């Protein structure tokens, strides 16, 4: 008996995932993202906030935000259910929704 050839359909698919900040919940957060000064937020947090926003923008997954541990990535509860936060300092946070690998409704806030 002759062996029958079985056709194989092998497709290699490359997917490029571009994660990014899709939207801002506050105009003031957008100002900081764009390298401008906000009068609403303390001047001593703005550079750190900008650095953390860049980190958020370049993250491909929520796990990326667990490093450095000082970010203290948290899933929030209550009124902020379905939002995450990372710390700027002990008082200020960057809050956002993570949808399909992108950050939405990003805002800098003192929600305590």
Regions found by a protein language model. Name each.
Residues 1-88, 92, 99-112:
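Basic, Lys/Arg-enriched alpha-helical interface segments
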